Each structure stands twice: as structure tokens, then as C-alpha cells.
A protein has these predicted regions:
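Amphipathic alpha-helical assembly/interaction segments
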Residues: 1-176
């Protein structure tokens, strides 16, 4: 029924092989290891309970932000509409920037392995370059009007008339 439509969509395996997904996965794995280090390290036992909790929270937040990147890449690659791709791209960018901020937070709360944070920052910078090139591939003319006005292609406004509104549609004559 939807074979023609589905043939243009990338499979999960195809998505996982893309450079941007691979880099997003590397970011997650590194953030996950950092969070585990904070959880397991005995060297944080000397911290007061509140400081330790802040460090643990910051590490879990870092992991959570990194965890959002790959699913949103899949979401953007799984569809063709510009506005939905851009919505996912904005969430990816936000998550990647939060990972960068999270590295600073971990330093602030006393994370003992700054070399891992530097590695993570380097991964995010490499990801940023891949991301900037990737979003250039989005087809700006394959869109629906975003009535919120946030993810429309250049020159399209939230209150523009949708040309699809002029297409005749008879719900009683719709094949099921």
C-alpha cells in the first residue's frame, strides 16, 4: 500500500552507517563512559553529599543530552519534509550544545578526568562540522507550512496560503 512512499525512506541500518549517526553514537558512548566514571569512582567519596549529588546529576544530564542525538538523526533521516527535518535538527543542535555545556559543568563540580571531557568536546566539534554539511542537503522545497513559523523554508511565512488548500477533495469519494 505504501511501498512507493517507503522506498525513498532510509532504513535504520542505512541511517546507522552514515557519518553523522556514527559520530553521534561516538558522542553518546563517550558521555556514557564519563557518567559511569562519576558513578563508580571512589575518588568522589570525599565530596560532601550535596556536591557529589550535583556531580552525579551533571553526569547523568550529560548522558541524557548525548542520548538524544542519534534518535533525532534517525527522525530527520526517516522523513522528507523540510520542516520536520529542521525541527529534529534544532533538537540535535540543542543536545550537542548541552553536551558542551555539560563538560563545563562537570569541571565545575570537580570531575577528575578533564582529558575525557576534552575528547568529548573534540567529538562534538567534529560532529558540528558534519551537521552543518548535513543540513545543507535538506530539500527546502519539500515542506508543509509550519503554522508556528519556526521551521519554514526561507521566504515562506506561517500565515501564507497553502496551495494544497485549492486541491479538490471529496471525502465521500476517497478510496480506502
Amino acid at each position: 500500500m505504501f511501498d512507493e512512499e517507503d522506498s525513498s525512506r532510509k532504513s535504520h541500518e542505512e541511517i546507522r552507517k552514515t557519518p553523522i549517526f556514527k559520530k553521534g553514537w561516538q558522542i553518546f558512548k563517550l558521555a556514557d563512559k564519563i557518567a559511569e566514571l562519576v558513578k563508580e569512582e571512589e575518588e568522589y567519596e570525599h565530596l560532601q553529599e550535596m556536591e557529589r549529588n550535583l556531580l552525579l546529576h551533571q553526569a547523568e544530564q550529560l548522558r541524557g543530552d548525548a542520548m538524544m542525538i542519534c534518535p533525532k538523526i534517525s527522525g530527520a533521516m526517516g522523513g522528507e519534509l523540510y520542516d520536520l527535518k529542521m525541527e529534529n535538527a534544532a533538537l540535535i543542535r540543542k543536545s550537542a550544545r548541552e553536551v558542551q555545556t555539560g563538560c563545563s559543568g562537570l569541571e565545575l563540580w570537580g570531575f577528575k578526568h578533564p582529558e575525557y571531557l576534552e575528547l568529548l568536546r573534540d567529538e562534538v566539534e567534529e560532529f558540528r562540522l558534519l551537521f552543518a554539511e548535513w543540513i545543507k542537503t535538506f530539500d527546502v522545497w519539500n515542506y508543509t507550512i509550519d503554522r508556528w513559523g519556526l521551521f519554514n523554508p526561507p521566504g515562506i511565512n506561517y500565515d501564507d496560503k497553502d496551495p494544497d488548500d485549492d486541491l479538490p477533495f471529496d471525502p465521500d469519494n476517497f478510496p480506502i
